């Protein structure tokens, strides 16, 4: 009877995926807090927006640079340990901010601690879980987890902004501390490193001879350590191997501008910019939440389009559309909502992470089996661009009293990204077998992506 009851229960992989989703959405939400802290910190401490934005930029850089090495840490120490420590770093960094009195403490807490913590829970975490626990429905799981990581911070914004508005920024920081700590028991109880740790095969896996199946679902400890060293070495050698490749620089340059024009500029400065024009902070944060909703739709649709159209043409269209939107934004900001602003939010949401599927596709065709590692560094350039925009836009606001130059500058750079995208080799020129291999690599290997 016990065996029959167990047979009716969902596979343990779905529990692992659910806990992973909660951790990813939470990590993205934790990274969203600085955008609603800018104004209250400025009011309380008298710090400039450029100074406060420097902490955000450190956070974004570390979030990106952690990605190529996060998989190695998970291989060496296990998923549960790495993610649990990452959540504790977030809780510690957020909790310590309530005692801060100087900007270096803000940079140390929200820049370094939260940046390292959330960076260890980027999409590399999702791809590792999906690759180990799923044979069937793997693509579906990766897609759902990607959406959670990419939109979690935008969905969290209205609630965090309301907390700051009603109870103060310290209360919001403490709520983040408690939330991050609360996820740790879920991770420790719900996640196992391999299906073999609980006597299971991956979801949808066919029965194999015991010895062969053991290697697939639970590699020996020595193999884990060896794979960790190989992963760390591959991350560094992968970068060195493409430094002279024009395709890499075109993709990295375009993704640098992608991060600059999303997470770094709009994600960090839209709320204070809208407040400059008289729009309440909670309302502005709610608009970013709407961006997050349409982000999900745009990402799924872009993946469908990438399978059917030239990825270069898609990127050219996405970046050009984004540039036009940013060029018009200074004319749309006002003290009240109107249809044109809502239209901007919807279109920008559809375009927010739509660049990811065609960028991954072009990485596959240009770099073959090296694509996962190369995309890790392309993603790092995305976060570097976000960091540059976070601090540069704050400096522009402090020097000119307005964000107008930042919007126009980003619009021009988006047009440059469209041009760079047109110079990358076309993924659809790759042979069919190669494309199939590329797809498998993209799913099995950890490919980080922005949480925009």
List the model feature ranges, each with a label.
Residues 25, 93, 105-121, 256-257, ...:
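Hydrophobic core of transmembrane alpha-helices in multi-pass small-molecule transporters
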Residues 145-198:
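Helix-loop-helix hairpin linking two adjacent transmembrane segments in secondary transporters
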Residues 88-101, 321-334:
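C-terminal ends and interior cores of transmembrane alpha-helices
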Residues 144, 153, 353, 366-402, ...:
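A late C-terminal transmembrane helix in Major Facilitator Superfamily
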Residues 66-79, 299-311, 397-398:
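Helix-to-loop junctions at the C-terminal end of transmembrane segments
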Residues 110-147:
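Cytoplasmic helix-loop-helix junction between adjacent transmembrane helices
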Residues 34-38, 243-302, 389:
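Extracytoplasmic gate region of multi-pass secondary transporters
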Residues 41, 120-134, 354-367:
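Intracellular juxtamembrane helix-capping segments at the cytosolic ends
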């Amino acid at each position: 009877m016990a065996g029959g009851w167990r047979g009716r229960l969902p596979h343990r992989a779905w529990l692992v995926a659910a806990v992973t989703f909660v951790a990813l959405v939470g990590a993205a939400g934790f990274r969203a807090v600085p955008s609603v802290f800018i104004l209250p910190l400025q009011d309380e401490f008298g710090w400039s927006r450029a100074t406060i934005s420097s902490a955000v930029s450190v956070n974004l850089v570390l979030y990106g640079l952690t990605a190529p090495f996060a998989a190695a840490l998970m291989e060496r120490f296990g998923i549960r340990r790495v993610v649990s420590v990452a959540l504790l770093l977030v809780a510690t960094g957020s909790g310590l901010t309530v005692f801060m009195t100087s900007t270096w403490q803000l940079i140390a807490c929200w820049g370094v601690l939260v940046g390292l913590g959330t960076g260890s829970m980027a999409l590399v975490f999702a791809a590792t879980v999906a690759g180990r626990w799923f044979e069937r429905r793997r693509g579906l799981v990766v897609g759902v987890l990607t959406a959670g990581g990419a939109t979690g911070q935008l969905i969290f914004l209205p609630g965090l902004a309301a907390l700051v508005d009603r109870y103060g920024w310290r209360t919001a920081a403490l709520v983040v501390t408690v939330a991050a700590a609360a996820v740790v028991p879920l991770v420790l109880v719900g996640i196992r490193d391999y299906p073999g740790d609980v006597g299971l095969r991956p979801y949808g896996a066919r029965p194999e001879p015991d010895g062969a199946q053991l290697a697939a679902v639970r590699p020996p400890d020595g193999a884990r350590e060896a794979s960790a060293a190989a992963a760390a070495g591959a991350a560094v050698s992968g970068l060195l191997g493409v430094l002279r490749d024009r395709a890499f620089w075109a993709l990295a340059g375009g993704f640098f501008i992608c991060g600059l024009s999303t997470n770094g500029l709009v994600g960090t400065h839209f709320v204070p910019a809208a407040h400059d024009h008289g729009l309440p902070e909670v309302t502005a944060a709610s608009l970013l939440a709407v961006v997050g909703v349409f982000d999900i739709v745009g990402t799924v649709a872009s993946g469908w389009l990438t399978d059917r159209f030239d990825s270069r043409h898609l990127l050219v269209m996405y970046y050009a559309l984004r540039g036009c939107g940013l060029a018009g934004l200074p004319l749309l900001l006002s003290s009240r909502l109107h249809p044109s602003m809502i239209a901007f939010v919807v279109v920008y949401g559809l375009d927010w992470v739509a660049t990811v599927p065609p960028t991954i596709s072009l990485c596959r065709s240009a770099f073959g089996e090296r694509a996962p590692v190369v995309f890790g560094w392309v993603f790092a350039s995305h976060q570097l661009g976000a960091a540059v925009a976070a601090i540069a836009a704050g400096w522009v606001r402090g020097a000119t009293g307005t964000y107008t130059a930042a919007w126009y500058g980003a619009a021009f750079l988006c047009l440059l990204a469209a041009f760079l995208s047109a110079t990358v080799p076309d993924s659809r020129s790759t042979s069919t077998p190669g494309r199939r291999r590329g797809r498998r690599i993209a799913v099995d290997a950890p490919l980080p992506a922005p949480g925009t």
